[in-house]
Amino acid sequence: MDGAELMRKVVAGFEKSDLRPLLDAMHDEIVWKTANKHKGLFRFDGHYKGKAVVVDVLAKLSVDYTFRSFVEKEILASEDVVWGLFDVSLAFDPKGLGRPAKDIELEMAIRWKLKDGKIIEHQAFFDTASLLIQQGAMAVPVPQP
């Protein structure tokens, strides 16, 4: 399976709340880079190394978010690097945080580096301010003149 097919398979699993395709595709030494670098904004931040650690991060992510759809806009693969651009729909249900559930819409880019046909590096890119606004955790900024 090439990198583009692998990404499509993993994303199809996410739409069904099935992490098995992702878990099967992860290299034991995976490095997982989140879109958030600041502590306290989300239950995830920074970089994580190793399959067991990443599984724990995914469990934390699943506490608040349920992915509903990943609509492919573009997937490009070149040798061992794969890029995907998606329109993502998800449910935000912040258990224990005292905030109401919300429907979220985001554009997300995902970059993978592969080793031996498995994901050795994952990085996601999305507008974290938009996510915080849609979650109700941040006010919509006043437009600048």
Located regions from the model:
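C-terminal and inter-domain tail/linker signature
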Residues: 1-145
